[in-house]
Each structure stands twice: as C-alpha cells, then as structure tokens.
Regions:
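FAD-binding core/adjacent interface of flavoenzyme oxidoreductases
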Residues: 67, 91-165, 181, 226-300, ...
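Long hydrophobic segments that form regular secondary structure
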Residues: 295-332, 389-390, 398-404, 411, ...
Length: 482
C-alpha cells in the first residue's frame, strides 16, 4: 500500500457481473473471479486504518487490512495463510456473506459526508468500500490453484479424537481448529456431501458446488475424516460416540421452518423454503432420488413471503425455473429488511417484484392456492431487539393472485429425541444451551459441545464458523490441550 491516496485515484470496481438477461436463465455464479491485477488494484485502496472497523465488524475478526496489504504487494500465499488463521471457509464467506452490513459496511471509505454507513458499492459523498468480500474469495481460490495448502508440518498428534456431528459451517470450523491442534476430527453428516445448507440449500448462482468439493479435499488433506450418509440416532447412536470419542461437538443447524400462523398455510401449492431450494439443488447436481419431489415453478405465479436471504434465494430460483411472475412480500420496508442489499438488488434486476410493508394474513383458495391476502403496514416503535414493529393499517386488505406460495419466515432448531437421554438442555425455542459451563460452548453434558445455528438460532454462515472454531477451543481446554 505505497500510495495512501490510491482511493482518490481508483474507484471501487467489483468483479464483472453477468447481465441479468443472461444469468436469469442459468444456475451459475454471477460474479467473475478477479484477476491478480484487479485484486491488487482494489486491495491497494485500503487505508490501513489504525483502528480497523472492518475487522471488528467481521464475526470471525479477519485480519482484513493485513491480508489486503499482502494482496496489494503480490504475496498470495502469505495472504492465504493469514486468511485461514481466522476463517475456515474464506472462499465461501467471500461469496455469501452480506458484506454490505458487515466488513464493507464498516469500511471507512464507505461513509457519506455525515459519517452514516451506507450499503456496499459507490455512494453519495463517499468513495465506495474496498471490495473485501471478492478479494477474500480471490485469495483462497488463486492460492489453491497455485498449489497452496494449509501448513500442517508442525502439528503434533495428541492421540485424542473428537466426533463432530454436522458437516455444515459450525462443524467444519470446529474440525479445522481441532485438526490444527493435533486432535483427530471425525465428521458425521446425514447428507452425501459436506457443507450442509452451503451445499444443498444455497443455490448455485451464489456458490457453485465444486467450491465445497474442493474444500473437502483440502480438509481431508489436513487429516479430517468424513463419514457421510450417516445420521446420529439412526445409523449411529449418540452413546456409541460418547464411548468411542474423547468429546463430541454438535453443529446440526436449523432445519424446521417457522410458520406464519395464518389460515391457508396447509393448502396444496404452499411450499416451505428449504424443501423447495434443496429439491432444486439436488436436481441441478443430478442427485435427486427416484421418489424425490421436484418443485417446479415454470409458468406459475409465485409469491414469496419473507425478506431474508433465504427468501431472495427462493425468488431468484423461481425466476430461473421460468415462473410466470415472482412477487416478494415483506412486512417492513426495504431499509429494515434482514437480507443483503446486494441480493435484493440482484433479484430486482432479474425481474422480481417487491411489495414492501405488506403482511400476509391469509393464503386463499378452494382446495389449492389461488392468492395471498395482504394488509399494508406502517413501522411503529422499535421492539426489544431494536427493530421497528410493523403496525397494520386498518382497511388496507388486498388479495394478489398466486399459483404457488413459498414461505421463507426463517428456521428454528429441531431438538433430537436423544437429547434428554444425554442431559442436553434446550431453551424454550429449542436452542441448545451451551453457555455458563466450565468451557466455551460446553453443554450441560460435560463431554458434549455445541455451536452454530442450533445454539444461537438461524444466522449467518460466518457466525456459525466462528462458534464452531470457538467451541473447538473449548474442547481443547476440556482435553487439557491448551
């Protein structure tokens, strides 16, 4: 970073994006990977702030200014090594993190004249945040292509082994840290590939599945063992794991969808978000089983209920399945929606119509979906979490036509029947209690640890990675290895 005024001479420039007219017909990633010159040019825009807000806004606290400097200077392998010190899945987070409200939203260059943070990209009065997410992706992918792999040469085997339940972000984060500290992780997952919802829930226009295939090869090279198509409580008992392993980590995510609690949710034509997305991914990957239902939106009038990233995935998948129309209804305004601004923008470009401040009160139809009854809302005072509460406007009911309705209100944990048998305590929402014990992320069973969505509730990939990594440190302390 030789020129501290580079940001004045060089504007923010994202990786090339496939035009909406092309990308809406294909399940391929829409952002091209930066080349070396582009990545170095953009990395050199970083100011190297003395108090880097980007680093603190990042849930895993990536050493962002440091690896940006290394990229700017052309030190790719060193940047990859540093990136992997804090993040087990940097090439994934570079793709799917909502950088506009995390690292890039906190970038000093991403402020207007009054210091108010603005979403990613160019903005009035500011200079445009450093392209942190795309550079993070560039570092790992180019380093892997050039032959870089995590350095395990100084790792000394401890003779300890830990069972990890779930090959999603939390489980992979935990296994990564354990392996780097000489503990043998054995990861169990019910699916036929690692990644959990990274593989089977996130559509390929956000992340193509070879990314996780490559990551699996990297992890196996580190000594991590995967036992797939194996469900705990069905194929292997929890007691067997407790008998064979020195500790157990649970990172099983959240898969039970949250209902809206209004009439008509059980009508034919109403779909849950995850089964819809999973069926599409499995079809794209040629993994669909003969008895598996594929939910096809071709020629249908689709209404998606919800405003998070899962709702955006449903919107954009429906577009690619050639739906006749796709309408997304959300009960707050665009500014207060939970999803990534980038994803909303991409969905809008691809033809999704948004109805803001609309709350569903009924799915209407005789024996099948015919429409959705909505009411208009206004934003009232903030709730306990600081979010403004939608207030219904009297007399504002309307019915919009629909052939299919996809419910994307979020997900909650699904406590397993064997939890009680093994003294695993959950709260009223079904989340595993993993605090207040002697070690980080230790459950009420001393040998069992947990992290990710099943502990905190449905959240980001990067928060699950962080909790898995922190839980691994708790396990190391429990095993007297710290």
């Amino acid at each position: 970073m030789g020129d501290v005024f580079r940001f004045l001479k060089q504007a923010r420039r994202d990786g090339e994006k496939t035009p909406a007219s092309v990308r809406k017909h294909e399940f391929l990633e829409i952002y091209a990977l930066m080349d070396a010159a582009h990545a170095q040019e953009q990395a050199d825009r970083c100011l190297g702030c003395g108090n880097p807000y980007c680093e603190w806004k990042c849930p895993v606290h990536n050493y962002i200014p440091n690896w940006l400097k290394l990229v700017a200077e052309g030190h790719l392998f060193e940047a990859a090594e540093l990136s992997h010190q804090t993040n087990s899945l940097p090439e994934v987070c570079g793709r799917v993190c909502p950088q506009d409200r995390l690292c890039e939203g906190a970038c000093t260059l991403n402020t207007d004249g009054f210091g108010e943070a603005v979403g990613g990209g160019p903005n009035v009065g500011g200079f445009g945040a450093v392209t942190i997410g795309q550079i993070e992706r560039y570092i790992s992918e180019e380093a892997f292509k050039a032959g870089w792999r995590p350095d395990m040469s100084n790792v000394v085997a401890t003779g300890k082994k830990v069972a990890v339940i779930g090959a999603g972000p939390a489980g992979l984060g935990c296994a990564d840290v354990l392996a780097r500290n000489g503990v043998k992780p054995v990861v169990f997952d019910r699916y036929d590939e690692i990644g959990g919802l990274l593989t089977f829930g996130i559509p390929e226009f956000k992340m193509e599945k070879w990314v996780m295939t490559n990551r699996r090869e990297v992890f196996e090279g580190m000594g991590i063992e995967f036992r797939l198509n194996t469900e705990i409580g069905k194929d292997v008992s929890m007691q067997a794991l407790l008998d064979e392993y020195d500790a157990v980590f649970m990172g099983m995510g959240t898969y039970t969808y949250m209902k809206g609690g209004f009439p008509g949710e059980d009508l034919p034509g109403v779909l849950e978000a995850l089964p819809f997305l999973i069926s599409n991914v499995r079809k794209c990957l040629d993994l669909a089983k003969p008895d598996e239902i594929f939910h096809d939106m071709k020629g249908q009038r689709v209404v998606v209920l919800g405003g998070g990233d899962t709702a955006m995935d449903c919107n954009r998948t429906s577009i690619r399945q050639e739906a006749a129309s796709v309408v997304c209804a959300y009960r707050r305004d665009e500014k207060n929606m939970p999803g990534s601004k980038r994803e909303v923008g991409n969905a809008r470009e691809e033809g999704v119509q948004f109805l803001w401040n609309r709350q569903p009160v009924e799915i209407v139809g005789d024996d099948k979906v015919e429409g959705v009854k909505l009411v208009t809302t206004e934003l009232g005072p903030p709730d306990a979490r600081g979010r403004r509460t939608p207030v219904v406007v009297p007399g504002s009911e309307e019915v919009i036509p629909a052939d299919r309705v996809i419910v994307a209100f979020g997900f909650r944990p699904n406590p397993q029947p064997w939890f009680e048998q093994h003294q695993i305590t959950t709260d009223a929402g079904g989340r595993v209690i993993a605090n207040g014990q002697a070690h980080a992320f230790q459950t009420t069973h001393p040998k069992i640890f947990a992290g990710g969505d099943m502990v905190r509730g449905s959240d980001l990939v990067v928060t699950a990675v962080w909790e898995g990594r922190e839980a691994a440190k708790g396990i190391l302390a429990y095993l007297d290895l710290l």
